[in-house]
């Protein structure tokens, strides 16, 4: 029995932004230029859909369903497809973006996000854009992370969903995880939940087990002897 090695477990570090940091980052690109609009759309989609960076690169006009119940079709790992709901704000932003850049209905099979050469946006291109604006924020706010990558938008979305008590099973489906144990890294990283659980137990412990030591003079004399 002693020769059997114990199973090693590791806790993955989850890098994410607060809601305030995320809002500041997303709203940084100017919307009075085509480039600024495109950059804002990229970051809005990364956060709102929780998409992996390659899923965003592969997104086409035909994958966007706008209207009363807007959704985005993401093409994930292993050719797996998942339908993700998007917010009303994201719906409005996409309506404006598509009408401005893709008014021709024949372009349904075109990639939603393109680079300045009118080609499919690459992973490196999106990483560059995200880091560009993160660096600007960092220069103005020392507390802002110096390194921000596209996957942090996905992490941040999961953590923010967890913070408003969205069930972990729904978060798993939203992110497209096969195994819920992958999603559980966010639950383990949420210290707010841990503190909440501890604080919920605290009143009972105090109420049921609290002893007023101030009335026990012998005990007080004993404790004072250690001074």
Which residues does each PLM region occupy?
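Conserved catalytic core of the tyrosine transesterase superfamily
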Residues: 1-227
């Amino acid at each position: 029995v002693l020769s059997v090695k114990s199973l090693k477990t590791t806790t993955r570090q989850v890098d994410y932004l607060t809601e305030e940091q995320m809002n500041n980052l997303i709203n940084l690109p100017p919307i009075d230029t085509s480039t600024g609009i495109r950059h804002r759309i990229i970051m809005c989609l990364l956060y709102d859909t929780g998409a992996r960076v390659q899923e965003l690169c592969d997104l086409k006009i035909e994958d966007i369903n706008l209207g009363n119940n807007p959704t985005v079709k993401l093409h994930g790992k292993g050719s797996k497809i998942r339908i993700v709901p998007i917010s009303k704000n994201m719906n409005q932003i996409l309506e404006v973006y598509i009408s401005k850049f893709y008014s021709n209905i024949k372009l349904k099979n075109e990639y939603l996000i393109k680079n300045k050469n009118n080609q499919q946006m690459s992973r490196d291109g999106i990483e560059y854009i995200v880091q560009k604006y993160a660096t600007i924020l960092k220069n103005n706010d020392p507390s802002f992370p110096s390194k921000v990558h596209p996957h942090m938008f996905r992490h941040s979305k999961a953590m923010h969903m967890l913070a408003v008590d969205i069930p972990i099973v729904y978060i798993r489906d939203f992110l497209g995880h096969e195994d819920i144990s992958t999603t559980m890294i966010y639950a383990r990283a949420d210290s707010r939940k841990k503190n909440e659980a501890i604080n919920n137990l605290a009143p009972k412990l105090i109420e049921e087990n609290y002893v007023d030591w101030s009335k026990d003079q012998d005990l007080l004399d004993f404790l004072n002897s250690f001074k």
